[in-house]
Regions:
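Noncatalytic linker/hinge segments flanking ATPase motor cores
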Residues: 41, 64-70, 112-117, 125-132, ...
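Aromatic (often tryptophan-rich) hydrophobic motifs at membrane interfaces
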Residues: 74-154
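A conserved beta-strand-loop-helix scaffold within acyl/acetyltransferase catalytic domains
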Residues: 2-107
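Short C-terminal domain-edge/linker segments immediately following a structured domain
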Residues: 30, 55-60, 104-105, 115-119, ...
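Terminal substrate-recognition subdomain of acyl/acetyltransferases
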Residues: 1-22, 124, 128-176
């Protein structure tokens, strides 16, 4: 998890903000929309190389039906939908649930941009934390999570500072 009130932007994160200053973000309750489903399908096929086409039912079950307060964040370049993020709004934190983007727009670093937006949004809501979900040290697709500091890892049911406990990072029980 990332502490929202003490978060510090890195130089590359500043560049990512600059690169995406033209984007508009809209907040919506979870609901099916065809352009969102098409973007999800494209993302799964091209980014994760999913061999099986996704169905509307898969999309609804995974991302639309939620037992907690959830918002969908739509990221637009003018009228073109580039990305969608899902966040859960909890009493003391926001939880970044999932994020999809147009793989053709990968150079924009939309995933990084979305987390920067979510940190700022959590701060506006006076939520001290943005939860980034599990962190797997050896997963290149999750390595970006360690770039958001200060952060804490959940280890043995206790939150510990990310960089003060490097010996924990090799453990399989570590999540961020």
């Amino acid at each position: 998890r990332v502490r929202t009130d003490t978060f510090k932007l890195s130089k590359s994160q500043r560049r990512t903000l600059q690169k995406n200053q033209d984007l508009r973000v809209e907040h919506h309750p979870p609901a099916f929309c065809q352009p969102g489903f098409e973007l999800y399908s494209k993302y799964q096929q091209n980014w994760h190389h999913c061999g099986t086409p996704v169905t509307e039912g898969d999309y609804l079950d995974f991302l639309i039906h939620s037992p907690v307060k959830t918002e969908m964040l739509y990221y637009y370049d003018q009228e073109r939908l580039l990305a969608i993020g899902w966040i859960d709004i909890l009493p003391k934190m926001l939880s970044s649930v999932y994020f999809i983007f147009d793989p053709d727009e990968a150079p924009r670093r939309l995933g990084v941009f979305s987390l920067l937006y979510e940190i700022e949004y959590a701060s506006r809501l006076e939520k001290p934390w943005l939860y980034l979900g599990y962190w797997v040290e050896d997963s290149p697709k999750m390595s970006y999570k360690s770039d958001f500091q200060p952060a804490e890892l959940l280890f043995n049911k206790k939150w510990v500072p990310f960089h003060q406990h490097p010996e924990l990072l090799a453990s399989q029980d570590v999540s961020n």
